[in-house]
Amino acid sequence: MIVLFAMPSYRQGEASIAGTTAKDFGFDLSGKPSHLSDLRGKVVVLNFWASWCPPCVEEAPSLNRLHKYIQSRNALVLGVAADEDNFAFSKFIIDQGVTFPNYRDPAAKDRGSPIALSYGTSVIPETYVVDRHGKIARKIIGPQRWDSPEMLAYFDALLGQN
C-alpha cells in the first residue's frame, strides 16, 4: 500500500461524508478498553497520523494546543497511529511531547491502518471532526494549524451547539 502525504494547505474532504455516522472502533488507552461510540456526548477530533509522516510531526504541537483549548469543554483530540512498530509510536509521542490520547492501530501494516482505511483515508494526516451525536461534522485533509484563529472559531461555534 502506498500512502501519500497531503499538501500543507487546508482542504476539506468530501461534502458527502458530513452528517454520516462515524465508524465505531475499539481502542485501548493505558489498559482501558473503549470504543469511539463510548465518547458520544463529546466532540472528538479524530486524527490519523504516523511517526514516519513529516507533516504529522509538523502539526503535532498545534494539536496539543487545540486539545488543551477544547478539553474542558467536553471535547478531545484522539490520535490513531498507522504505525506497525510500537517503539516508533511511543518514541513519537515522547519526542513530540504529545499530550492528547493516542492509540496505535495494532492491525496497521504496509504504512496503512485498517481503522483509517474504513474511514476512506488515503493520505495522512487526515482528521475527522465527530460531533456530540457521533456524526462526522467535517473531514480535513492534510496538516493544519489547529490553533489558528479560523480553527478556534470553528471549534467555538461547534462546541456552542447542542
Over which residues does each language-model region extend?
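Short pre-active-site segment immediately N-terminal to redox-active cysteine/selenocysteine motifs
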Residues: 42-44, 48-52, 123
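N-terminal targeting signals for export/organelle localization
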Residues: 1-24, 162
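Thiol/disulfide oxidoreductase modules built on the thioredoxin-like
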Residues: 91-98, 105-157
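Structural microenvironment flanking redox-active thiols in thiol-disulfide oxidoreductases
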Residues: 57-97, 107-117, 153
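A short beta-strand-turn-helix
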Residues: 24-44
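Active-site acidic short loop of glycosyltransferases
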Residues: 39-42, 72, 98-99, 121
